[in-house]
Amino acid sequence: MNNLYQRDCLRLLDFTSLELQNIITLAQKLKQYKKNNKEIQLLKKKNIALIFEKESTRTRCSFEVAAFDQGAHVTYLGPGSTHLGTKESIEDTAKILGRLYDGIQYRGHHHSTIEILAKNSKVPVWNGLTEKFHPTQLLADLLTIKEIFPERKFYEIKCAYVGDAHNNMGNSLLEAASLVGLDLRLVAPKECWPEKNIFKFCKEQIKNKKGNIICTENINEGVKNVDFIYTDVWVSMGESKEVWKKRIELLSSYQVNSLMLKITNNPQVKVLHCLPALHDQKTCTVKSILKKYGFKNGMEITDEVFQKNQKIIFEQAENRLHTIKAILVSSLLKTIKF
């Protein structure tokens, strides 16, 4: 019996440490099957609803391709194409979608919305991103880390997340570290540290996993001897220009660049980025943002560092597909046979 059957994925703490590592192992198998053209369609006749209140490239494509590869059908419900929470309550929408579909993905603004969907739909609900958590991204990150260091335990791996940690990525990184025992350093000004209650809980949980979690403003302390430096954009579309200005001023000295890589004292240090990245000026939007705030060579990461690490970064992005596929398979099948 598959103990993940009919389970939601709203945040990583929905799973035990063993369950999380089993999902990663399943993702490795599914990735290998796809690479070898030996995909086994386990989700035939399954129907999946994809609710996107916030638009996306990687999340939408990963869910759609994962479903198609496995023989499932999807319905894309984009921004403005449902009455969710406007003409129809979230509860009522959840109840009807739960009758029509075998599973629901939600990507939107409020974590409370996905909690209501999960409570009322009676089918598995998966979090594609909310303002509080981004679990499918962290599953891809853990798979990427495991592929690079297959022989090492997670508690033997040091990872520094540099930048804004007061967001869904900071919260989900904390939860991931607390479950698998990662040695995690969140390197940011205090104003950009994660929520205290989540940090405190995860700090307590990790004591049983041999790993460690710290928050520090000190870049030298945070990145010394790490195996990975991880960063994300400092600003998001839809936020006010006042928020952008304040955050960029706070984070301007936390850019991932060649000097920061030298500070790690690890010539083999790897760089992760969950994308999109403001590393060059090849789009009008990014060009105008960089010019406005006085950045000539990328914002949160320089183009030089991005290009040197692009193989890993794009592998990390591809791994969204394989880990999401593992979530779909594990939550929609009573038993999993290969």
Swiss-Prot record:
Q: Which InterPro entries match?
A: Asp/Orn_carbamoyltranf_P-bd, Asp/Orn_carbamoylTrfase, Asp/Orn_carbamoylTrfase_sf, Asp_carbamoyltransf_Asp/Orn-bd, Orn/put_carbamltrans, OTCase_ArgI
Task: List GO BP terms, alphabetically.
Answer: arginine biosynthetic process via ornithine; arginine catabolic process to ornithine; citrulline biosynthetic process
Q: Which PROSITE patterns does the entry link to?
A: CARBAMOYLTRANSFERASE (PS00097)
Record-listed carbamoyl phosphate binding positions: 56-59, 107, 134-137, 274-275, 320
Q: Disulfide bond: is it a keyword of this entry?
A: no
Q: Tell me any Pfam family this protein matches.
A: OTCace_N
Name the pathway.
Answer: Amino-acid degradation; L-arginine degradation via ADI pathway; carbamoyl phosphate from L-arginine: step 2/2
Q: Which residues bind L-ornithine?
A: 168, 232, 236-237
**GO function term, MF aspect, one:** amino acid binding
* Location(s), subcellular: Cytoplasm
Q: Which UniProt keywords apply?
A: Arginine metabolism, Cytoplasm, Transferase
Annotated signal sequence is none
Q: Which GO terms describe its cellular component?
A: cytoplasm
Query: What is the predominant subcellular site recorded for this chain?
Result: cytoplasm
Reaction(s) this enzyme catalyzes, per UniProt: carbamoyl phosphate + L-ornithine = L-citrulline + phosphate + H(+)
Q: Which SUPFAM superfamilies match?
A: Aspartate/ornithine carbamoyltransferase (SSF53671)
The organism's superkingdom is given as: Bacteria
Q: Does the keyword Cytoplasm apply?
A: yes
Similarity comment: family membership: Belongs to the aspartate/ornithine carbamoyltransferase superfamily. OTCase family.
Q: What role does it play?
A: Reversibly catalyzes the transfer of the carbamoyl group from carbamoyl phosphate (CP) to the N(epsilon) atom of ornithine (ORN) to produce L-citrulline.
Name the UniProt record assigns to this protein? Ornithine carbamoyltransferase
Q: Which organism is it from?
A: Buchnera aphidicola subsp. Acyrthosiphon pisum (strain 5A)
